[in-house]
């Protein structure tokens, strides 16, 4: 007691002096004061002043109370002295908390502090030494907290160490030290509930109070190399001493103890073996000053929380004496707020047992220098260890090392070594893998890091496992830290070679290449894999060439196809067809309809083109047998050609992958990379054998590639795929594996894995290692047994190697089809250029090409004429320019001829001389209007004076509003308003042979059609003469109307049902419905007054005259449905024929109809042969058979056998007027190259105006005389040597009426268009009109009061302006539509009537056309039927033939003439 009192007397004055002023200051401020005492042992190198200064104003900022720190240093820390010091301190300073630390390792200190806290309820923090030792059981009312870990926390770290190093087999040794049961229970519970394959072999509990013999007996039961020990430090000395005597502390044994055993790290008993592992509180990184500061912070934070919640803090204890045995527990204590505390950003919370929730534990090992070394750290429930492989320590000098346990280093490189993470569930390595440790850097600047447990597998790992079983050794495997194979840098080896050289590893296993430099420092086993240097490149998506669609065939094949085969075959087909007797160009077959379409070279090419590409295009098939055989062979060729093209097309339309072709390391791309643009980029992984080989053999190459070197293989593969690298040079075995396992198989090795500088992989061992021989023998055994081959198949073969020959199909993109689109775009551009050139040529240049500019024959005409001359051997004479024709173009010359016809006088001046007068029409325009009466079998010219007459109704009557109105329907000339009713019957006046007489009749024939000029044979224009008796009696017609034809009067008649349209025509062909037409009658819906049936501007005389013609027995009335919708449908023509023919009429065979049941009532008029010259001009060959072309709806059934007579000739004819010319023996199917003198003198530049070459008539004889002369000379039924005029071919002859009811046995021209069976829907020419027949006016003749206007003739079907469209008609034109003639009538003349009113008036005209006069009041349309008989002209005579575009009549212009060149 005296000693304690002396200590108290020395200490208390100082405490009072320090505490008094602070407490007074706190009282003055009114803030509560918190007194905390710090007691430490004198062994710590710290003073009391330093302890008080640990809490300064910085730490007290923001606290609601004043903190007073009382620091004391104790010399003795035995239990008695400890209790005395604490009680004296409480009595003198009235403290609220205590921070205690000592320098002992006695757990009794912690027990004493726990007792004091349970008695005084003052919170005590044990921060160091014995005060922080583990306590088994604390008092329930204890307020003692320790900076340490509980038994369970330390046991968890111990098991984690064994798990990381795969020490799954262990034994547990304990004493009866307090807490041992908790330790054993926790270990067993953890092992039983863990997925780790723990194997706890023994649990030994020792009682050290007995003799050592018993302890040895228990320790002998241990058979595991890992032992967990739980005891006090003094007991551990005894147990480890006995274990050493039993040999349990050598290389193969690992003792792991808690902090209770290690105690104070500065005190190390000599019995502790080297390599002893302990889990301890962190004294290395957690200093005593930091612990004191954290203790003060914990108490201050708890007091502040209590003050904030309860507004007070517990009253400080004044003394620990006089306490009851069981003190009363206060309602609120400070330690309740110490459980969850966060201070200075650290979680310093405590558990209910008084231990830290997150203690700072470390793993320490007693190294060979007998010092505790920190090798691991437990932080945030994570253990990090320094050593990849736990070092084997030689515990004592008498211990022998274990040479069978090897430390092996490896390198991650697939497929030889593949590193994976551990199983997250079991935290171990799965089957077929071995544990390996990998160093992971935490701080790159300081190279600080930790070794993490990984799992390794691969080709080399499987070899290692086989070697371990065969050679009998154990190993610890770890990955090299720098990830290199090994290179000597600054005379220091790195990588795996460095680990072996510096004996950190016994063996190096992996993709380690054997070379001379490495063999100098290490020993290599025999190679187990053959390898070398290879080059890897990446496949890049190639581009499809725009000409890929042409690549299935070579250029020569395409040339042969389109140039040689197509042209030659097309010419052959054309030639065979041209000279075939049954072809299109030879209409010689019996019963063959003449004037059919021609089979041209263009049609032949189009046919063959359609066959090659199997296009459904309209083509015209040949009819000749030879040409059909040729086409059949071509069709067979086309099948093979197209099939071959289709089969090969897919292979060329896919995107071909591009691969850089490299032949080897000496390739130009490696040696001279700058020669390429961009430069060739290649690299390798440095510090390897590949780099060394390149450096030694190719210095320039090595210097260039250093900037493209990669850190590893994976980085190189990424660079290849992203285009940063063009080639990667590396070990062949690795590259082959990567190429085989690459996703998408985009990486390939050159030459299918071609190897340069062949070498192998081997195992590196320390120089002079005893393991080399055993390992070499084992490897050779693996090779001999085939085990090595199995491993190579398992690991080194990739899936891409097995799929090399598989075809990978993909969707065709726009790149694949770009060439086709380019071709279409080029075609569009070429079409646009052609379109512009076509318009430029037509409007600007064609006149010069046709010779108009130079008045010389044009180029095209000259070529055509030259070809003809060469083929037929005909000499072509140059034509002299006619002085009478000085206009530009043949059409202008034709107009000039038409204008010269405007010299017709009125009735008073109507004589032969006046008719031939050259006066202009202006001289007669004031003398009255002209009405041409449509009188059957008579031509009466009836004239009346001009008078005003206002029509009561329009020609359309009540249905006028149903008609369509068009903007431009006529020609731009003023002639468009005049009626040209077609070709009229012509005879030659016997008194004046140079005079042509025209017969004007009202009967119009409906069954005619236009035809082409050059397609018609010359012989088809000849007709036989016939004899007939004059008949004057005819039956009267019924009141039914008949529909008239739409054909233009410009053409010769032809069969309606047999169109002249070629089967390859691209124009739409209009038909009428052939079905059920025989008895079809069109409904008359006009229902209008009589006045509405006639033109609005007809005079009374004209109207009266026309009305009187209705009762004529020879009239045929055309009707049309007036209430029909304006859809331009053509109704079938209806003929009302009530004509009674005289029985004595003789019909010659020459003009027999094709249908015996139709038109038998119409007699034909034989022409006088006397006016005809060149009587020997007509052919008499049997091959030419002529037919009358006047049959209509009902006359298509006549047999072809009833033909006309045959004629033959050996001379030729004039190409213009058809006059006979001698010395020609050619075919009449060919166009004659000669002309008569008249045509040569009067013709224009081109011989395409032959239809104007009519003789200028002289003074005619009277009508009766001419008629009698003609009639008397034609009774012999022989019309000989009659020549017909030639009409020009025009391009609007493709519109057909609805097919008449025909005899199906007589085939019509086939048409391949889809609209063959279609009605003429929507046609512009579907609206026709009904015209009543007028009664004859007797033989009263009235003359024309005015001349004919020349503008009646059109110079072209193509309008000069877009507004002058002849295909459109206006309402005004519809008002002026009249009935037109039937173009088939020129082939037939009706017998003249014997009645008074049945005489013809023959007028000498310049034109054979009939004209309807126009006065200044408007139009006076008259219904005209004209009959033009083909004739033959004398030599040196010129006849002007009509070329009529009658825009006033119901005839419409159907098609445009393409160009003048079509006639050439």
UniProtKB/Swiss-Prot annotation:
Q: Where does Zn(2+) bind?
A: 44, 128, 266, 282
Q: Which GO terms describe its cellular component?
A: cell surface; cytoplasmic vesicle membrane; dendritic spine; endoplasmic reticulum; glutamatergic synapse; membrane; neuron projection; NMDA selective glutamate receptor complex
On whether DNA repair is a keyword of this UniProt record, the answer is: no
Where composition is biased (Basic and acidic residues), the residues are: 1033-1043, 1052-1061, 1070-1083
- Spell out the residue ranges making up region: Pore-forming: 599-620
Question: So which residues are the signal peptide here?
Answer: 1-22
Listed under GO biological process in this entry are: calcium ion transmembrane import into cytosol; calcium ion transport; chemical synaptic transmission; directional locomotion; dopamine metabolic process; excitatory postsynaptic potential; glutamate receptor signaling pathway; ionotropic glutamate receptor signaling pathway
Q: Does the keyword Ribonucleoprotein apply?
A: no
Tell me where the transmembrane regions lie. 557-576, 626-646, 815-835
Q: Which residues bind L-glutamate?
A: 511, 513, 518, 689-690, 731
Q: Which residues lie within the membrane without crossing it?
A: 601-615
Pfam families with a match to the protein in the record: ANF_receptor (PF01094), Lig_chan (PF00060), Lig_chan-Glu_bd (PF10613), NMDAR2_C (PF10565)
Recorded GO molecular functions are: calcium channel activity; glutamate-gated calcium ion channel activity; monoatomic cation channel activity; NMDA glutamate receptor activity; zinc ion binding
Entry-listed glycosylation sites: 75, 340, 380, 443-444, 541, 687
Q: What is the deletion mutant like?
A: Mutant mice appear grossly normal and are fertile. NMDA channel currents are decreased in mutant brain slices. Contrary to wild-type, where tetanic stimulation leads to a strong long-term increase in synaptic strength, only modest long-term synaptic potentiation is seen in mutant mice. Mossy fiber granule cells from mutant mice present a decrease of the slow component of the excitatory postsynaptic current. The slow component of the excitatory postsynaptic current is nearly abolished in mossy fiber cells from mice lacking both Grin2a and Grin2c.
From start to end residue, where is composition biased (Polar residues)?
A: 1023-1032
SMART domains reported for this sequence: Lig_chan-Glu_bd, PBPe
Which segments of the protein form a coiled coil according to its record? none
Please state what the annotation says regarding this protein's domains.
Contains an N-terminal domain, a ligand-binding domain and a transmembrane domain. Agonist binding to the extracellular ligand-binding domains triggers channel gating.
Task: Tell me what this protein is called.
Answer: Glutamate receptor ionotropic, NMDA 2A
Please report the organism this UniProt entry assigns to the protein: Mus musculus
Q: Gene for this protein? A: Grin2a
């Amino acid at each position: 007691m005296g000693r304690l009192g002396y200590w108290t007397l020395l200490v208390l004055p100082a405490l009072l002096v320090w505490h008094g002023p602070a407490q007074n200051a706190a009282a003055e401020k009114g803030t509560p004061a918190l007194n905390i005492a710090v007691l430490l042992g004198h062994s710590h190198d710290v003073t009391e002043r330093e302890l008080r200064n640990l809490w300064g104003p910085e730490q007290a900022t923001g606290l609601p109370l004043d903190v007073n720190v009382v620091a004391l240093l104790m010399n003795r820390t035995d239990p008695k002295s400890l209790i005395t010091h604490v009680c004296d301190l409480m009595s003198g300073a009235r403290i609220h908390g205590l921070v205690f630390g000592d320098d002992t390792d006695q757990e009794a200190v912690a027990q004493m502090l726990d007792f004091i806290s349970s008695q005084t309820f003052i919170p005590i923090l044990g921060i160091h030494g014995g005060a922080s030792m583990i306590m088994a059981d604390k008092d329930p009312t204890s307020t003692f907290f320790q900076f340490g870990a509980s038994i369970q926390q330390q046991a968890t770290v111990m098991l984690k160490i064994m798990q990381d190093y795969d020490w799954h087999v262990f034994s547990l040794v304990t004493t009866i030290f307090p807490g041992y049961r908790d330790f054993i229970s926790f270990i067993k519970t953890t092992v039983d509930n863990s997925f780790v394959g723990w194997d706890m072999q023994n649990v030994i509990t020792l009682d050290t109070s007995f003799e050592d013999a018993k302890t040895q007996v228990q320790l002998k039961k241990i058979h595991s190399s890992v032992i967990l020990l739980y005891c006090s430090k003094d007991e551990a000395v005894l147990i480890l001493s006995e274990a050493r005597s039993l040999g349990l502390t050598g290389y193969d044994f690992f003792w792991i103890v808690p902090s209770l055993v290690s105690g104070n790290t500065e005190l190390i008993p000599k019995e502790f073996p080297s390599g002893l592992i302990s889990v301890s509180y962190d004294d290395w990184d957690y200093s005593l000053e930091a612990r004191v500061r954290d203790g003060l912070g914990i108490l201050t934070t708890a007091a502040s929380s209590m003050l904030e919640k309860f507004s007070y803090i517990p009253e400080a204890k004044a003394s620990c004496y006089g306490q009851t045995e069981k003190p009363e527990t206060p309602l609120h204590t400070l330690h309740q707020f110490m459980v969850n505390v966060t201070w200075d950003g650290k979680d310093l919370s405590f558990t209910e047992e008084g231990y830290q929730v997150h203690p700072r534990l470390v793993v320490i090992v007693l190294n060979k220098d007998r010092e505790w070394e920190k090798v691991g750290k437990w932080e945030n429930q994570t253990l990090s260890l320094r050593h990849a492989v736990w070092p084997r320590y030689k515990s004592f000098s008498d211990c022998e090392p274990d040479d069978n346990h090897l430390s092996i280093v490896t390198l991650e490189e697939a497929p030889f070594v593949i590193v994976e993470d551990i199983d997250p569930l079991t935290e171990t390595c799965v089957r077929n893998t071995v544990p390996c440790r990998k160093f992971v850097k935490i701080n790159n600047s300081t190279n600080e890091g930790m070794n993490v447990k990984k799992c390794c597998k691969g080709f080399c790992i499987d070899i290692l496992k086989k070697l371990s079983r065969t050679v009998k050794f154990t190993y610890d495997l770890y990955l090299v830290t720098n990830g290199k194979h090994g290179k000597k840098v600054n005379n220091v080896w790195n990588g795996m070679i460095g680990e072996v050289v510096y004996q950190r590893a016994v063996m190096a296993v992996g993709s380690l290449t054997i070379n001379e430099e490495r063999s100098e420092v290490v020993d290599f086993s025999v190679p187990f894999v053959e390898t070398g240097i290879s080059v890897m490149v990446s496949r890049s998506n190639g581009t499809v060439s725009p000409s890929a669609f042409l690549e299935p065939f070579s250029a020569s094949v395409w040339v042969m196809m389109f140039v040689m085969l197509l042209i030659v075959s097309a010419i052959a087909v054309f030639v065979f067809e041209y000279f075939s007797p049954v072809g299109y160009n030879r209409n010689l077959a019996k019963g063959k309809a003449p004037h059919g379409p021609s089979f041209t070279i263009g049609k032949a090419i189009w046919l063959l083109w359609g066959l090659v590409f199997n296009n459904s295009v309209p083509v015209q098939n040949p009819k000749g047998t030879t040409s059909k055989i040729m086409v059949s062979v071509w069709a067979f060729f086309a099948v093979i050609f197209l099939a071959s093209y289709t089969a090969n097309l897919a292979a060329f339309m896919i995107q071909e992958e591009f691969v850089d072709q490299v032949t080897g390391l000496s390739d130009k791309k490696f040696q001279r990379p700058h020669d390429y643009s961009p430069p060739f980029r290649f690299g390798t992984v440095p510090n390897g054998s590949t780099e060394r080989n390149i450096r030694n053999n190719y210095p320039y190459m090595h210097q260039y590639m250093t900037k493209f070197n990669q850190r590893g293989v994976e980085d190189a593969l990424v660079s290849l795929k992203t285009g940063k690298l063009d080639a990667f040079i590396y070990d062949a075995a690795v590259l082959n594996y990567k190429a085989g396992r690459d996703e998408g198989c985009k990486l390939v090795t050159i030459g299918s894995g071609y190897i340069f500088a062949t070498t192998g992989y081997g195992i590196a061992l320390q120089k002079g290692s005893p393991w080399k021989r055993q390992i070499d023998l084992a490897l050779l055994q693996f090779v001999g047994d085939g085990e090595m081959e199995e491993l190579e198949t398992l690991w080194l073969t990739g899936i891409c190697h097995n799929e090399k020959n598989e075809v990978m199909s993909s969707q065709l993109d726009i790149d694949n089809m770009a060439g086709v689109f380019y071709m279409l775009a080029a075609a569009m551009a070429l079409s646009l250029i052609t379109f512009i050139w076509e318009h430029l040529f037509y409007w600007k240049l064609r006149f010069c090409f046709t010779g108009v500019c130079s008045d010389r024959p044009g180029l095209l005409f000259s070529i055509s004429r030259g070809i003809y001359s060469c083929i037929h051997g005909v000499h072509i004479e140059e034509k002299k320019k006619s002085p009478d024709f000085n206009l530009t173009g043949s059409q202008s010359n034709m107009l000039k001829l038409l204008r010269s016809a405007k010299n017709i006088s009125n009735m008073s001046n109507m004589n032969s001389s006046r008719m031939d007068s050259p006066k202009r029409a202006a001289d007669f325009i004031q003398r009255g209007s002209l009405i041409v009466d449509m009188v059957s079998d008579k031509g009466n010219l009836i004239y009346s004076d001009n008078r005003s007459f206002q029509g009561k109704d329009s020609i359309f009557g009540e249905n006028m509003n149903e008609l369509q109105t068009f903007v431009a329907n006529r020609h731009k000339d003023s002639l468009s308003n005049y009626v040209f009713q077609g070709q009229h019957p012509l005879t030659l006046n016997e008194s004046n042979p140079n005079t042509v007489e025209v017969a004007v009749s009202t009967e119009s024939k409906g069954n005619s059609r236009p035809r082409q000029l050059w397609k018609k044979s010359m012989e088809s224009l000849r007709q036989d003469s016939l004899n007939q008796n004059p008949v004057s009696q005819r039956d009267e017609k019924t009141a039914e109307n008949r529909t008239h034809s739409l054909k233009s009067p410009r053409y010769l008649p032809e069969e309606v049902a047999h169109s002249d349209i070629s089967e390859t025509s691209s124009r739409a062909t209009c038909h009428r419905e052939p079905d059920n037409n025989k008895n079809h009658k069109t409904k008359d819906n006009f229902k209008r007054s009589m006045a509405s049936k006639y033109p609005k501007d007809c005079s009374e005389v004209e109207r009266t005259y026309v009305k009187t013609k209705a009762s004529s027995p020879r009239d045929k009335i055309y009707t049309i449905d007036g209430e029909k919708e304006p859809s331009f449908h053509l109704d079938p023509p209806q003929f009302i024929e009530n004509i009674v023919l005289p029985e004595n009429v003789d019909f010659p065979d020459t003009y027999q109809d094709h249908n015996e049941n139709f038109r038998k009532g119409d007699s034909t008029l034989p022409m006088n042969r006397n006016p005809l010259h060149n009587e020997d001009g007509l052919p008499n060959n049997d091959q030419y058979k002529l037919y009358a072309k006047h049959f209509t709806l009902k006359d298509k059934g006549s047999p072809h056998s009833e033909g006309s007579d045959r004629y033959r000739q050996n001379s030729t004819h004039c190409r213009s007027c058809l006059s006979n010319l001698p010395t020609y023996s050619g075919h009449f199917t060919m166009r004659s190259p000669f002309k008569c003198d008249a045509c040569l003198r009067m013709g224009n530049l081109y011989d395409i105006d032959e239809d104007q070459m009519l003789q200028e008539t002289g003074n005619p004889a009277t009508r009766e005389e001419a008629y009698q002369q003609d009639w008397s000379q034609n009774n012999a039924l022989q019309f000989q040597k009659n020549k017909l005029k030639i009409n020009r071919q025009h391009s609007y002859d493709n519109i057909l009426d609805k097919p008449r009811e025909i005899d199906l046995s007589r085939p019509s021209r086939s048409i391949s268009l889809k609209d063959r069976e279609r009605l003429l829907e929507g046609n512009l020419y579907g609206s026709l009109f009904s015209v009543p027949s007028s009664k004859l006016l007797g033989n009263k003749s009235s003359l024309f009061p005015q001349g004919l206007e020349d503008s009646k003739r059109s110079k072209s079907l193509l309008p000069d302006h877009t507004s002058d469209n002849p295909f459109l008609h206006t309402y005004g034109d519809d008002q002026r539509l009249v009935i037109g003639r039937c173009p088939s009538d020129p082939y037939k003349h009706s017998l003249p009537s014997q009645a008074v009113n049945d005489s013809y008036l023959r007028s000498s005209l310049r034109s054979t056309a009939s004209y309807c006069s126009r006065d200044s009041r408007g139009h006076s349309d008259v219904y005209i039927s004209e009959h033009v008989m083909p004739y033959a002209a004398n030599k040196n005579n010129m006849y002007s033939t009509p070329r009529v575009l009658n825009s006033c009549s119901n005839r419409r212009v159907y098609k445009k003439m393409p160009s003048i060149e079509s006639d050439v």
